[in-house]
Amino acid sequence: MPFNPLERAFSWKHLTATNQISSKSGMLHTITINRGDPAAASIVTVYDGIGVTADIIAIIILDTALYTVPTTLVFDCGYLTGLYITFSAVTLADITVSYK
């Protein structure tokens, strides 16, 4: 059978603030750090759920001293309840999340 690139396609969302990505089970593929804030590091927390009381998948420090941007972090992990992402502060940082 010929290769169909759409069979492996992921949805994506570009975020600059706290956001509910999904409210059902799925797979977190990647998080790309597009820009960090040189003035103040922000912490991004990734939850398996629909709010901040859910299980934590990852805590990511967005600091331009730590990353060369853009940087893509590969997770390829499942989530059971949903995918919720918070930013610790309003900064110039932004990320792109790809998921199924």
Predicted region positions:
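Surface-exposed, low-hydrophobicity beta-strand/loop segments enriched in small/polar/acidic residues
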Residues: 1-100
